[in-house]
Amino acid sequence: MEQQNNIPKHIVLFPDGNRRWAKEHGFPTLEGHRRGKENFEGFLSWCRARGVTVITVFGFSSENWNRPEEEVHYLMDLFEEYLGSVKDVEKFQREGIHVNIIGQKERLRPSLQKVIAHVEEQTKNNTQFYLNLAVSYGGKWDITQAVRKIVQEGIPAKEITEDTIAQRLSTAGLPDPDLIIRAGGEKRFSNFVLWQGAYAELYFCSKYWPDFGEQDLDDALVEYAKRQRRFGH
């Protein structure tokens, strides 16, 4: 694809459809998640090649804790494998990727918390590309924890602005999303980046995430480039 001028700086990704993909192909649910992880690694490279500088991916929601125990355990294994492998951490360093895990980290198992702390520390000075991986995350939770911080800091009500809240969200310091891509055919927000995504453009793809390819990203970018963003005006 030729480089476009109107490339979104920040893309939010809903990599939906792993379980449905597995079912339709006669695979176990866990295989769908494994294929989804592999596809995300490609997606990251495609975005970087096109000039995107921030990716926020919905890895595991607050509500996903209600899924079968085996599935939850496997997903935690995938996160730990992806964030904890020496090869991947070296790649993050080599390519200047700043990794930030957003969500209720205290709910994660200790070994995963340790891996997260390590990769965040190792990549904290990288500035070429930002990867936000949402694990045990919910948009309502994010706003709630920001409000709690404001209360704890004793900020008077009359001094609270939108910026006061935005600066205390888990994505503070990064630009708000420009484009939200959701694979898998669903057309809803699912309690993700509710505040940050207020003025983002939405793009829905009917393909399940493991089948989402480079051309599908380009289709989303072409559609984004055609739109006139109004930011509520």
Model-derived features: positions:
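Flexible, compositionally biased loop and terminal segments
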Residues: 1-233
